[in-house]
From Swiss-Prot:
It catalyses: (2R)-2,3-dihydroxy-3-methylbutanoate = 3-methyl-2-oxobutanoate + H2O; (2R,3R)-2,3-dihydroxy-3-methylpentanoate = (S)-3-methyl-2-oxopentanoate + H2O. Its EC number is 4.2.1.9. The gene is ilvD. Coiled coil: none annotated. Pathway: Amino-acid biosynthesis; L-isoleucine biosynthesis; L-isoleucine from 2-oxobutanoate: step 3/4; Amino-acid biosynthesis; L-valine biosynthesis; L-valine from pyruvate: step 3/4. The modification N6-carboxylysine is found at K137. InterPro entries: DHAD_IlvD/Edd, Dihydro-acid_dehy_C, DihydroxyA_deHydtase, DiOHA_6PGluconate_deHydtase_CS, ILV_EDD_C, ILV_EDD_N, IlvD/EDD_N. One of its GO terms (molecular function) is 2 iron, 2 sulfur cluster binding. The active site is at S485 (proton acceptor). [2Fe-2S] cluster binds at C61, C135, C207. Its cofactor is [2Fe-2S] cluster; Mg(2+). Keywords: 2Fe-2S, Amino-acid biosynthesis, Branched-chain amino acid biosynthesis, Iron, Iron-sulfur, Lyase, Magnesium, Metal-binding. This is Dihydroxy-acid dehydratase.
Length: 570
């Protein structure tokens, strides 16, 4: 790939940060340490590139990131004037943690990742950063950390997984989650239940639908912080290896031209990122994370920006969880660049935004494949959308005075009025499914699991999957002050602000109350008289904190509400 920059170029030192340590004669101990890690005399004048991966053995999304990081380090070291230094940070496997209390740590991990990238690179004076994330919170954590440092940076996505297969049926991670509901209702045999579990995940790569990881990877490529095709190159592919091999030249180009995240991550670039999320039918988590990423670079993005763009942006991608296809299928028809090329042609994107290639978004995709709407139905044209407007809707009302996020594909309708069934937490809901407490026409209310109440705002993938598997996905709605996985589908509303423990009305809902959700007029309301609400509020007792020490307690104390991205550094 060719890298360039159209702006004014001035001669700069590539090692302008690391020279603080490598060139200062009053730092002999520092320089002795460098010799200790194998530096040669000529290495002290080189720009240091920190290569951070979220590699660990315990997650298919991340198990190969160390290998990718090593390839990137080799690419950097083969590039004149650069030296690569690998480091690592943590991750949480959402697929493993979902459904249990460990899921409270997932969103927290985004902040830990950002903090550790900032901490390591800030202390070590790296001149540039390359991040290699895999699972959901890895991506925004990486971008937030790089934005805070504001040094030349590139994100290399670990890549999507291939589909699994059992008895001729294609599987993915959500197949395993939904099998639980089928098991509870007796709609799957023990043998097939085990067969789905054994075959849903065939190996390396992030969960394969348009779930949170793939959504954010596509958004970040569109934002301009990844090389073209990064988000749709499969984890196990020659294309992903080739991408790693290009990073040395790419990061040197950014260093030479002093192109920083603040030059790339503009208001218009974030609008592009939101647009691709809508077009691809992406995860509700994109709302939370794009707001947080923008905050880190000093750009104001709010929930209302999502609604504004949703109002004029159709859903064109037929991807799981609500559609048919996986991201590996998108790769076969030209990947995200082919989609961007089409959207630019139709005037849906800002084409003049700068990217990590040193070129604009429009220049990056000029040679991408053209989408052929005759030979494939993975992506539809604007005149034949899956949904005429965006699937992510921001709802307000007495149940969500600070807003909430609904994921409405259109298949489940756009209006729901039903009877509340209240659950204080995820396990309470699962118990309710198993006991037959939920029926058609009910609105499940899962509360006290917000950023503070959770703490950590865990995802409700297990409940929504159980609802689908039990055959109630089209006849029940679910609302929560928690989050949803990118794998969630159905009539669902999350991110309710204020959350229950912060005085939100969701904390006062009782069984048999009437709840109305209107995705046409963007409202969510509890149909209970004001005097009755006042009586309940007077008698309300706030639950005791679930965490009083450690990282969960710190998060609960520092976090902003979901409407502000749950950031912790304001």
């Amino acid at each position: 790939m060719e890298f360039k920059y159209n702006g004014k170029v001035e001669s700069i030192e590539l090692n302008k940060y690391s020279k603080t340590l490598t060139q200062d004669p009053t730092q002999p101990a520092t320089q002795a340490m460098y010799y200790g890690i194998g530096f040669k005399d000529e290495d002290f004048k080189k720009a240091q590139v920190g290569i951070v991966s979220m590699d660990w053995d315990g997650n298919p999304c991340n198990m190969h990131l160390g290998t990718l990081g090593s390839k990137i380090k080799n690419s950097v070291n083969q590039t004149d004037g650069l030296i690569g230094l690998q480091f690592h940070t943590i991750g949480v496997s959402d697929g493993i943690a979902n459904g249990k209390l460990g899921m409270r740590y997932s969103l927290v991990s985004r902040e830990v990742i950002a903090d550790s990238i900032e901490t390591n690179a800030g202390a070590e004076y790296y001149d540039a950063i390359v991040a290699v994330p895999g699972c959901d919170k890895n991506m925004p954590g990486s971008i937030i950390g790089m934005a805070r440092l504001n040094r030349p940076s590139i994100m290399v996505y670990g890549g999507t997984i291939e589909h699994g297969e059992y008895k001729g049926e294609k599987l993915n991670i959500v197949s395993a989650f939904e099998a639980l509901g089928q098991k509870i209702t007796g709609n799957i045999s023990d043998e097939d239940y085990h067969g789905v579990i054994c075959n849903a995940i065939p190996g390396q790569g992030a969960c394969g639908g348009m779930y949170t990881a793939n959504t954010l990877a596509a958004a970040i490529e569109t934002l301009g912080m990844s090389l073209p095709y990064s988000s749709s190159n499969p984890a196990v592919s020659q294309e992903k290896e080739d991408e790693c091999d290009e990073i040395g030249l790419a990061i040197k180009n950014l260093l030479e031209k002093d192109i920083k995240p603040s030059d790339i991550m503009t208001k218009e670039a974030f609008e592009n990122a939101i647009t691709i999320v809508m077009v691809l039918g992406g995860s509700t988590n994109a709302v939370l994370h794009i707001i947080a990423m923008a905050n880190a670079i000093g750009v104001e993005i709010t929930q209302d920006d999502f609604q504004r763009i949703s109002d004029v942006t159709p859903v064109l991608g037929d991807f799981k969880p609500s559609g048919k296809y996986m991201v590996e299928d998108l790769h076969k028809i030209g990947g995200v660049p082919a989609v961007l090329k089409y959207l630019l042609k139709e005037g849906k994107l800002h084409g003049d935004c700068l990217t990590v290639t040193g070129k604009t978004l429009a220049e990056n995709v000029k040679t991408a494949l053209d989408l052929d709407f005759e030979s494939q139905d993975i992506m539809r044209p604007l005149e034949n959308p899956i949904k005429a407007t965006g699937h992510l809707q921001i709802l307000y009302g007495n149940l969500a005075e600070g807003g909430s996020v609904a994921k409405i594909s259109g298949k489940e309708g756009e209006f729901f009025k039903g009877t509340a069934r209240v659950f204080d937490g995820e396990q309470h809901f699962i118990d309710g499914i198993e006991s037959g407490r939920l029926h058609a026409g009910d609105v499940a209310v899962i509360r006290n699991i917000g950023p503070v109440g959770g703490p950590g705002m865990p995802e409700m993938l297990k409940p929504t999957s159980a609802l689908i598997g039990a055959g109630l996905g089209k006849s029940c709605a679910l609302i929560t002050d928690g989050r949803f996985s990118g794998g969630t589908h159905g009539f669902v509303v999350g991110h309710i602000v204020p959350e229950a423990v912060e005085g939100g009305l969701i904390g006062l809902v009782e069984d048999d109350d009437i709840i109305e959700i209107d995705a046409v007029n963007n409202s969510i309301s509890l149909k209970v008289a004001d005097d009755e609400i006042a009586r309940r509020r007077a008698n309300y007792q706030k639950p005791a904190p679930k965490a009083t020490r450690g990282v969960l307690a710190k998060f609960a104390k520092l976090t902003r509400p979901a409407s502000e991205g749950c950031v912790t550094d304001l």
